[in-house]
């Protein structure tokens, strides 16, 4: 492309400080360096993680910053050493990478790349410790190696999944974080068998994606657990057969669930990050074969407390990161599930706005009115 090797000026939504509305600014995006790729973003979605680090409550504030990590785009140019991607390729940026060379990447059991694992505090490129974004010469920090709230961004090649160019980027863009995290937690880690019972704790976008995994796995009963009763109606679209609000019961929710299922759930997936929900998720599964999977991220001071007899009675507790998907290896296959109409991504996308209205997307999520709001970069 004619822009290869040159600085590109484009629009980006800059977070200048915590909790303040994002500002659409003209930024300069430098060419990609070794093992980097410059991507033209066509669609980007808002994930709760973006909101979390924009609020910066209890987090290291890294500002000014370009947030965003769920997106779909096209390769504009590649840096030295990049052989797997070429200009014109369709890609999904991912907040965690796959170098394909470390012990984790070589292991069939792990997706936690040593080199490119998520780093929320690093606001620069891993290669040279510098930003590729500037405004009038002043550096603007990156976010989790992706920074997709920009018409162009620079990303390490290991954090880009090359996908089928026929796949609609305005739909499959949501696969690059939340959906895959929840869906993979069920199908790759909990692995319910056809006819089994599954409980999902937390019915936000990640929880509903986990529920979709249970539905496609043929679960006979899917119990949604949430403190907001308004979420049950929406959850029915994702296969939810029963709804439990812990506030409606005088006894602990795990006891309620054990009674409902004649001894406990076959599988349970926790998607809230609340430590009490995590413990309940484990304690509600059936002894002998029950499997609980933790997806939500707890606070740094949380401690998981349960009686050791739960383990001796052969209940299994697992954790997962990004649904146990290796980004470059596995995401193209998840895209193909959508192309074969086995995944229904449309029901997760509740809103769509032009990129210029990005603050509307933040408002919708803060009010709890959206699952995913996709922003169109060309408007």
From Swiss-Prot:
CC cofactor note: Binds 2 Zn(2+) ions per subunit.
One of the GO biological process terms: formaldehyde catabolic process
Amino-acid positions noted as binding an alcohol in the UniProt annotation, renumbered to this chain: 49, 69
UniProt-annotated binding residues for Zn(2+) 1: 47, 49, 69, 177
GO cellular component annotations of the record: cytosol
Alphabetized Pfam families for the sequence: ADH_N, ADH_zinc_N
Keyword Oxidoreductase listed: yes
Cofactor: Zn(2+)
A GO term for molecular function: S-(hydroxymethyl)glutathione dehydrogenase [NAD(P)+] activity
Gene3D superfamilies tied to this protein: Medium-chain alcohol dehydrogenases, catalytic domain (3.90.180.10), NAD(P)-binding Rossmann-like Domain (3.40.50.720)
Keyword line: Cytoplasm, Metal-binding, NAD, Oxidoreductase, Zinc
Domain of life (superkingdom): Eukaryota
Residues engaged in binding Zn(2+) 2: 99, 102, 105, 113
Tagged with keyword Cytoplasm: yes
Subunit text: Homodimer.
Protein name: Alcohol dehydrogenase 2
Originating organism: Oryza sativa subsp. japonica (Rice)
Lineage of source species: Eukaryota, Viridiplantae, Streptophyta, Embryophyta, Tracheophyta
């Amino acid at each position: 492309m004619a822009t290869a090797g040159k600085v590109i000026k484009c629009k980006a939504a800059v977070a200048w400080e915590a909790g303040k509305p994002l500002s659409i600014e003209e930024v300069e995006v430098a060419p990609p360096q070794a093992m980097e790729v410059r991507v033209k973003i066509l669609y980007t979605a808002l994930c709760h993680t973006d909101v979390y680090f924009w609020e910066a409550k209890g987090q290291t504030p890294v500002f000014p910053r370009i947030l965003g990590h769920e997106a779909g785009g096209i390769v504009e140019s590649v840096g030295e050493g990049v052989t797997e991607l070429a200009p014109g390729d369709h890609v999904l940026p991912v907040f965690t990478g796959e170098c394909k060379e470390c012990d984790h990447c070589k292991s069939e059991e792990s997706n936690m790349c040593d080199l490119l694992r998520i780093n929320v505090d690093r606001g620069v490129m891993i290669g040279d410790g510098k930003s590729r974004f500037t405004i009038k010469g002043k550096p603007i920090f990156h976010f989790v190696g992706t920074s997709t709230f920009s018409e162009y961004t620079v990303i390490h090649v290991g954090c880009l999944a090359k996908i089928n160019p026929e796949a609609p980027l305005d739909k499959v863009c949501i696969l690059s974080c939340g959906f895959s995290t929840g869906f993979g937690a069920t199908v790759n880690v909990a692995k319910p068998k056809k006819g089994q019972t599954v409980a999902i704790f937390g019915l936000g976008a990640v929880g509903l994606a986990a529920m979709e995994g249970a539905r496609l796995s043929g679960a006979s009963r899917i119990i949604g657990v949430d403190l907001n009763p308004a979420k049950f109606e929406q959850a029915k679209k994702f296969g939810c057969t029963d709804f439990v609000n812990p506030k409606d019961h005088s006894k602990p929710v795990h006891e309620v669930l054990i009674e409902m299922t004649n001894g406990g759930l076959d599988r349970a997936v926790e998607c809230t990050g609340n430590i009490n929900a995590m413990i309940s998720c484990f304690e509600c599964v059936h002894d002998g074969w029950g499997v609980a999977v933790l997806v939500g991220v707890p606070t740094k001071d949380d401690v998981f407390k349960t009686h050791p007899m739960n383990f001796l009675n052969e209940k299994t507790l697992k954790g997962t990161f990004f649904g146990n998907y290796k980004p470059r290896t596995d995401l193209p296959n998840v895209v193909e599930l959508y192309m074969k109409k086995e995944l229904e991504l449309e029901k997760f996308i509740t809103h769509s706005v032009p990129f210029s209205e990005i603050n509307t997307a933040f408002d919708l999520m803060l009010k709890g009115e959206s699952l995913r709001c996709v922003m169109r970069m060309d408007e």
